[in-house]
């Protein structure tokens, strides 16, 4: 039973640049009627999935949003609607990394509701397991599945390095800022997560939280918590190593420990401890504070973000078309569906993730992805978690 | 050795036939053992990619040494704990006038049906501040139960759910105990305690050691319990490196784990060899007389009840407590289907069947072989049992994809994985059964003109049947619980109870995970009852 894979974590790939906020035709979910645009898909072979033909049922945006606590006052999502994408049919084999409590499976079920001829056969396992499996399949020239959907971008990097991916068309992923997709178009981000500093609003105000990570040991360090064994924390340290160097990371880890930072098992616990007043602040992925808010009555917790350094890292879950897909165009159309306004709304409202297309807003009062000052690093390099383990051990942390 | 050796060579058989038969058996056992070791090929290949100086650096750094020490402490403590629980339970249910003996006999074996990761989860969520126990016990004035975690928590949980290995093997030894020796000792003025120490115990030691071996190796390879209890051991180190894309490092640690397993195996072999080697042989039906518990009846019952309460009542009770409660997970509605239960039963049954068939030659050769190498195939089969599931799964994946890719994406690869991981349990029980059958019976059948195969079928097989059933039961139960390798090797659409538990557990919603966990325990429990009642040693 692996606990490290239970959530969004890990990371790699894509160069962060300023995103151009492209507006796509506003498809106000409920009313627009499906027009089959750009039928790229041919008929699939060997029972593979295909696109362009097949039937489509009527659906509502509400079934994508679910009934979570942040749904109430949301603006209509804009972007390409599922109604404007080629219909999907046949069978798609999807390697689905991570659990997310079957949430992504819910998305698949929504798609199967819409397309009666569509079957999605998913094989769900920890992302690391699947990446290693696909890598081995690629070595034996026997990649089985069409699509890899991973909660860990590092896994996507490993798979594309193994030559197991097919290039996505530039058109299909044009709505995603270049920071969140591979330069070679081997994969694309479908949902993002930001590093954040949850703080207790009874103890601190937003201005008390320093704007760079390096200032924390001398300011809030003694009343903070972290979860060093957690994958996302390790990606954060990896980012620090990439921006500065190993020595800086070791020094920072030592300074934080000397300041008296408290260790927790995971970042949900860190966030809960902040809300309970046991900590003034912590290091955690942004969505944990939202989960704490969703399950408690107005807890005193808010999020702060550092500026332009590792503390503001935005990492992604992403999708790749595998060499196992006979019909690349159809598989690409499947990926387009994950980037549709409805699917992005799903990721935002159900998993509290950052949407990857500019037409869909993050939940709550989170800053949009453009407003975050994320560091300019190549996400693929975050897969060097081994080097980070060495650094953390060097700093006396048990990982 | 012993008197029976004189009957070894049956004059009526030409020695060339004997040699040929023993050669066939050796070849068969050897190739089975090699097949079981195939997943290790990948592990060795991965490890060989790391330069030697780096290997030394990894092995000698403080963290590695700490973790070796932690692992040794855990394995030792759980093994001792299991002996302290399992042996008294076996003695009470076999040798005393414990009330409801048959009931306790079955109950004492039942904790095997509960996966240790579920047990660990139950104890963690039950104890400490805000735990379920605190909720339940608050009305009767108990305010707080200390949190069970770390080393203590790991030892308690692993002991509670692995002691049945020791219980079952000790019980089998007790049932074949020669009562006349004890009576002789008593008549020579030895006290009951002294007779136990000088006569009974030496005869029990190999049985206890066989069970303790399984406990030690299980503890060595278990990831879930120490991880949930936050106690740092080898398996967690392997997962950390695996997760950081350092398969080569993970492989080195896996080989180190195998090394530790070999040490344990060697220790157990020594214990067995120092014994006279004949303790197992059942010469007659003279069982030792029943010991009257007298005023110890109360404490004995209290002991049995406490173990049953902690191991069998607490986990299902906690699961029922969570059932239908929402605990702040993020939702997800991947619904439970009964086909998952059927899938689990189906692959686990196949694994049990194949394991028993494959174990027989190894066990027979090890028990009856004359060469000092005869035990090698049997001993080497334990390697798979000591390796964490994810490493074994990747090794199997490599072997399958490169050499037998027709197996890939079938149920067969899962069966193969379970056989590699869990067959040693069947080898162990079968070996003791073979040792218990008197060779003279086979020789007699042979002199009456039966071929060796026919003698085996007519004489040996009926006698080893309890061992076959016990072995099949153990493999079945552990296969039902297997999670790590199953996640890697199953094909799309094929979910077992364990993989479904993983799937819903990751939503952090305990309420959703409670139902499949209860079904897993229920289905395993029922299968266990059927097995126990049908053949295994309940009717003494």
Question: Where are each of the predicted segments found?
Answer:
Chain B
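Transmembrane alpha-helical segments of polytopic membrane transport and secretion proteins
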Residues: 1-28, 270-305, 530-540
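Peri-membrane helix termini and adjoining interfacial loops of integral membrane proteins
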Residues: 2-8, 44-56, 128-140, 229-235, ...
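Membrane-water interface segments at the C-terminal ends of transmembrane alpha-helices
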Residues: 18-49, 62-174, 203-223, 252-268, ...
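Transmembrane helix boundary and interhelical loop/hinge segments in multi-pass membrane proteins
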Residues: 51, 171-181, 192, 231, ...
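Short amphipathic alpha-helical coupling elements at transmembrane boundaries
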Residues: 53, 57-60, 105, 138, ...
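Juxtamembrane helix-boundary/capping and inter-helix hinge elements in multi-pass membrane proteins
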Residues: 96-100, 175-180, 189-193, 243-247, ...
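Glycine/proline-centered hinge or cleavage motifs at structural transition points of membrane proteins
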Residues: 188-189, 202, 448-449, 462
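Glycine-rich helix-loop "coupling/hinge" segments at transmembrane-helix boundaries
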Residues: 220-247, 483-510
């Amino acid at each position: 039973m692996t606990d490290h894979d239970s959530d969004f974590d890990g990371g790699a790939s894509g160069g962060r640049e300023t995103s151009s906020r492209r507006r796509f035709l506003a498809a106000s979910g409920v009313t627009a009627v499906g027009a089959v645009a750009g039928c790229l898909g041919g008929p699939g072979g060997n029972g593979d999935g295909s696109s362009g033909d097949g039937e489509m049922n009527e659906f509502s945006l509400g079934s994508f949003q679910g009934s979570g606590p942040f749904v109430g006052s949301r603006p209509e999502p804009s972007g390409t609607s599922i109604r404007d994408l080629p219909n999907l049919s046949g069978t798609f084999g999807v390697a689905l990394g991570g659990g997310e409590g079957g949430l992504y499976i819910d998305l698949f079920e929504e798609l199967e509701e819409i397309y009666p001829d569509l079957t999605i056969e998913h094989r769900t396992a920890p992302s690391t397991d699947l990446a290693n499996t696909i890598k081995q399949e690629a070595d034996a020239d026997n990649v089985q599945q069409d699509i890899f959907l991973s909660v860990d971008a590092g896994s996507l990097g490993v798979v594309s390095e193994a030559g197991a991916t097919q290039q996505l068309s530039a058109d299909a992923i044009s709505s995603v800022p270049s920071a969140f997709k591979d330069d070679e178009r081997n994969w694309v981000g479908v949902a993002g997560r930001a590093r954040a500093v949850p703080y207790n609003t009874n103890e601190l105000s937003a201005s008390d939280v320093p704007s760079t990570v390096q200032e924390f040991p001398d300011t809030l360090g003694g009343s903070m918590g972290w979860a060093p064994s957690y994958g996302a924390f390790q990606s954060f340290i990896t980012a620090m190593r990439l921006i500065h160097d190993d020595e800086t990371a070791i020094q920072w880890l030592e300074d934080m420990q000397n300041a008296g930072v408290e260790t927790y098992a995971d970042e949900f616990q860190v966030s809960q401890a902040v809300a309970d007043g046991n900590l003034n602040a912590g290091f955690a992925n942004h969505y944990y504070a939202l989960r704490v808010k969703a399950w408690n009555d107005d807890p005193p917790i808010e999020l702060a973000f550092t500026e332009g350094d590792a503390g503001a890292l935005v990492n992604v879950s992403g999708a790749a078309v595998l060499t196992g897909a006979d019909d690349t165009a159809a598989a690409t159309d499947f990926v387009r569906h994950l980037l549709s306004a409805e699917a992005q709304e799903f990721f935002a409202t159900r998993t509290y993730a950052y949407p990857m297309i500019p037409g869909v807003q993050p939940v709550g009062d989170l800053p949009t992805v453009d407003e975050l000052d994320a560091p300019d690093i190549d996400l693929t390099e975050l897969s060097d978690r081994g080097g980070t383990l060495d650094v953390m051990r060097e700093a006396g942390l048990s990982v | 050795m012993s008197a029976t050796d004189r009957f070894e060579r049956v004059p009526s058989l030409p020695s060339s036939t004997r040699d040929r038969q023993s050669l066939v058996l050796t070849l068969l056992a050897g190739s089975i053992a090699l097949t079981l070791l195939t997943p290790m090929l990948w592990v060795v290949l991965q490890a060989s990619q790391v330069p030697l100086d780096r290997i030394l650096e990894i092995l000698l750094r403080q963290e590695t040494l700490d973790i070796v020490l932690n692992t040794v402490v855990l394995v030792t403590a759980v093994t001792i704990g299991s002996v302290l629980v399992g042996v008294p339970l076996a003695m009470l249910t076999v040798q005393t006038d414990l009330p409801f003996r048959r009931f306790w006999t079955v109950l004492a074996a039942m904790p095997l049906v509960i996966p240790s990761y579920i047990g660990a989860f139950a104890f963690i969520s039950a104890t400490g501040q805000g735990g379920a126990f605190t909720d339940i016990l608050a009305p009767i004035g108990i305010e707080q139960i200390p949190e069970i975690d770390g080393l203590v928590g790991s030892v308690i949980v692993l002991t509670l759910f692995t002691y049945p290995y020791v219980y079952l093997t000790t019980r089998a030894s007790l049932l074949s105990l020669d009562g006349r020796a004890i009576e002789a000792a008593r008549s020579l003025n030895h006290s009951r305690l002294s007779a136990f120490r000088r006569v009974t115990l030496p005869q029990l030691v190999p049985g206890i050691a066989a069970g303790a071996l399984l406990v030690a190796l299980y503890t060595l390879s278990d990831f879930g319990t120490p991880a949930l209890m936050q106690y740092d051991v080898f398996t967690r180190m392997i997962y950390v490196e695996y997760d950081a894309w350092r398969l080569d490092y993970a492989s080195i640690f896996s080989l180190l784990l195998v090394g530790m397993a070999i040490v344990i195996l060697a220790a157990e072999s020594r214990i067995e060899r120092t014994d006279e080697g004949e303790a197992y042989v059942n010469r007659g039906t003279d069982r030792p007389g029943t010991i009257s518990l007298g005023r110890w009846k109360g404490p004995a019952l209290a002991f049995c009840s406490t173990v049953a309460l902690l191991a069998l009542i607490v986990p299902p009770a906690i699961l029922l407590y969570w059932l239908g409660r929402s605990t702040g997970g993020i939702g997800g509605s991947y619904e439970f289907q009964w086909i998952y239960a059927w899938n689990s039963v189906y692959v686990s049954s196949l694994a049990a069947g194949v394991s028993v068939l494959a174990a027989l030659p190894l066990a027979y050769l090890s028990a009856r072989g004359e060469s000092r190498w005869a035990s090698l195939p049997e001993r080497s089969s334990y390697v798979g049992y000591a390796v964490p599931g994810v490493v074994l799964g990747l090794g199997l994946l490599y072997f399958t994809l490169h050499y037998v890719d027709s197996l890939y994406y079938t149920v067969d690869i899962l069966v193969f994985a379970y056989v590699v991981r869990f067959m040693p349990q069947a080898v162990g029980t079968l070996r003791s059964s073979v040792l218990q059958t008197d060779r003279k019976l086979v020789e007699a059948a042979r002199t009456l003109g039966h071929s060796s195969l026919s003698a085996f079928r007519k004489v040996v097989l009926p006698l080893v049947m309890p061992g076959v059933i016990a072995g099949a039961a153990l493999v079945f139960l552990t296969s039902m619980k297997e999670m790590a390798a199953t996640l890697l090797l199953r094909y799309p659409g094929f979910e077992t109870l364990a993989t479904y538990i993983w799937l819903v557990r990751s939503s952090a919603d305990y309420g959703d995970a409670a139902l499949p966990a209860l079904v897993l325990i229920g289905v395993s429990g029922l299968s266990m009852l059927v097995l126990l009642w049908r053949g295994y040693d309940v009717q003494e």
